[in-house]
Amino acid sequence: MLEISSKTNLLEQKSYKYSLQDVAEPNLQRDVYSYGTIPKVAFNHRRVPMSMPEEIWITDTSLRDGQQSVEPYSVDQIVNIYKLLSKLGGPYGIIRQTEFFIYSKKDREAIEKCMALDLKFPEITSWIRATKEDFQLVHDLGIKETGILVSCSDYHIFKKMKMTRKQAMDYYLATVKEAFNAGVIPRCHLEDITRADFYGFVVPFVNELQRLSRDAGVPVKIRACDTMGYGVPYTE
């Protein structure tokens, strides 16, 4: 079927709709990611045209991901870093958002002190696991957007979560609905995407997220996380 593309305004073949490929055993892609050699790069010779957005900005993770590689920050350090991020980003919000942990009393105290500064940028967001209990913390703090950990490789789905692909997808979608119900914009962090079955899980999952977003009239953000650092900068 042909259709006018909303991206190119040209007549194109309608995109194929990928469906979830539920499997009994995990595909760990040992031919690519073996334990004995460096990861291999397979070429598919597909050119992906650049599509530059009208605006480019930074979403900062110094206060969340950054804390996982250094000694944990004190409340005063978090507040000072937040002030510096606002100053660096300027009045137009080049540094548009930043992420916070919310689990400890110290984390929540730091968020409350940063909120009290009433700075326009960077917007304070959080990062949580896909659980109802974590959403309650977000709601109680009055945060409008949160990152949600949605692991998408079979390594994580089968080995860490002890689920099948369908069970994981159903669980994630139910969690996103909880975000909608709480009045929170979900930002889905697709963990370990470079080791995931892209067309058998990632694309069908994102399609379902888009459907939920349309039905609810609430935006859903997607973050592609190259957790293991296996991504390459070229498209072919």
Task: Provide a role label for each language-model segment.
Residues 23, 48, 53-58, 70-94, ...:
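Alpha/beta enzyme core
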